[in-house]
């Protein structure tokens, strides 16, 4: 299956990064390099791109796409939480801009072999790095009902979390839950018929929750953003695209803390805690895709872009 990357809010990202000729930019979720190639085109012959991804198939696709740019590109297999270590290994002391395009890619969702989607029956997996960490199959077959319910409730914001977890535990007693199709059917049975008639597919929230847990997406995000800000040069921009409220909340709160670090009580006449502002927030409200983009690419519908600048 071909890895096709349709970059979300491309023009908004390029403007948000405030690109300059000869600059060094990091795409922390390089994927198929849709954003990355556009950055290279806009930064001239001396511009550089460092692309990070933990999915080897994504990196292979990026490498194929970026062949014409030769030594201007460094592609690294890593988790974006290790951005500092990646730059250190490359001998890069600072960068001019950083992009995070969070969540799962269309390729990962659409490729049955990756086991992400409830729409295609396949072996349950959901790992962005298919060689590391427990898969979703392992989680649903080993965690207690309480542990599963907490994941589904916290990461999926699913009102029927405890009922779904109970059904999963009961069903796996008969035989291990191995496929996306069987898991989706179990979830569908767990949710009352009246609730199933409302909103999106009944398995959507649970699948999202399991994917987030498998890949530690929210667990590492805040730290990754702080690490990214540390390696930005003054005036450098960080752009973050999120796709659900949990991600966006973390980005918003992390930016707020970095922009207003004072922890002194409000009644203090002056700051004595020594907190130092690291960024200024460029987007008071998140940027969202245009109606035209959503029509062309429905998966962009929930995207939000937040931008900050290093002081």
From Swiss-Prot:
Q: Where on the tree of life does the source sit, at the highest rank? A: Bacteria
> Gene3D superfamilies of this UniProt entry?
Putative methyltransferase TM0872, insert domain (1.10.150.170), Vaccinia Virus protein VP39 (3.40.50.150)
Q: What are the binding positions for S-adenosyl-L-methionine in this chain?
A: 33-35, 53, 80, 101, 108
> Keywords assigned by UniProt?
Cytoplasm, Methyltransferase, rRNA processing, S-adenosyl-L-methionine, Transferase
Give any single GO term for biological process: rRNA base methylation
What's the Enzyme Commission number for this chain? 2.1.1.199
Localization per record: Cytoplasm
| Group of enzyme by EC | transferase
Q: Which reaction does it catalyse?
A: cytidine(1402) in 16S rRNA + S-adenosyl-L-methionine = N(4)-methylcytidine(1402) in 16S rRNA + S-adenosyl-L-homocysteine + H(+)
Which GO molecular function, any one, fits this protein according to its record?
rRNA (cytosine-N4-)-methyltransferase activity
Q: Which GO terms describe its cellular component?
A: cytoplasm
| Any Pfam family matching the protein | Methyltransf_5
Q: What is its main location?
A: cytoplasm
What does the UniProt function comment say about this protein?
Answer: Specifically methylates the N4 position of cytidine in position 1402 (C1402) of 16S rRNA.
Which family does the record claim for this protein? Belongs to the methyltransferase superfamily. RsmH family.
Q: Which HAMAP family did the record assign?
A: 16SrRNA_methyltr_H
Question: Which protein are we looking at?
Answer: Ribosomal RNA small subunit methyltransferase H
> Which species is this record about?
Pelotomaculum thermopropionicum (strain DSM 13744 / JCM 10971 / SI)
């Amino acid at each position: 299956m071909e890895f096709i990357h349709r970059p979300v809010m491309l023009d908004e990202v390029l403007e948000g990064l405030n690109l300059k000729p000869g600059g060094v930019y990091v795409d922390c979720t390089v994927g198929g390099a849709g954003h990355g190639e556009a950055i290279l085109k806009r930064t001239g012959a001396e511009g550089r791109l460092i692309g990070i991804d933990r999915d080897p198939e994504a990196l292979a696709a990026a490498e194929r796409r970026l062949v014409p740019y030769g030594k201007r590109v460094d592609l690294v297999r890593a988790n974006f939480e290790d951005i500092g270590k990646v730059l250190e290994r490359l001998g890069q002391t600072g960068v001019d801009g950083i992009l995070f395009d969070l969540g799962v890619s269309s390729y990962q969702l659409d490729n049955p072999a990756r086991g992400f989607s409830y729409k295609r029956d396949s072996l349950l997996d959901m790992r962005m790095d298919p060689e590391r960490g427990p898969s979703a199959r392992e989680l649903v077959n080993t965690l207690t009902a309480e542990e599963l319910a907490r994941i589904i409730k916290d990461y999926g914001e699913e009102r029927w979390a405890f009922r779904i977890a109970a059904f999963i535990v009961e069903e796996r007693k008969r035989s291990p839950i191995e496929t996306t199709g069987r898991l989706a059917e179990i979830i569908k049975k767990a949710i009352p018929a009246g609730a199933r008639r409302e909103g999106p597919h009944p398995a959507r929230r649970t699948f999202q929750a399991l994917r987030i847990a498998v890949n530690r997406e929210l667990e590492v995000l805040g730290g990754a953003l702080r690490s990214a800000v540390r390696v930005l040069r003054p005036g450098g921009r960080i752009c973050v695209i999120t796709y659900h409220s949990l991600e966006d909340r973390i980005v918003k709160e992390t930016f707020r803390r970095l922009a207003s670090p004072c922890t002194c009580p409000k009644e203090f006449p002056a700051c004595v805690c020594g907190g130092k502002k690291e960024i200024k927030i460029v987007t008071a409200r998140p940027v969202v895709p245009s109606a035209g983009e959503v029509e062309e690419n429905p998966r962009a519908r929930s995207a939000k872009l937040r931008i900050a600048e290093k002081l």
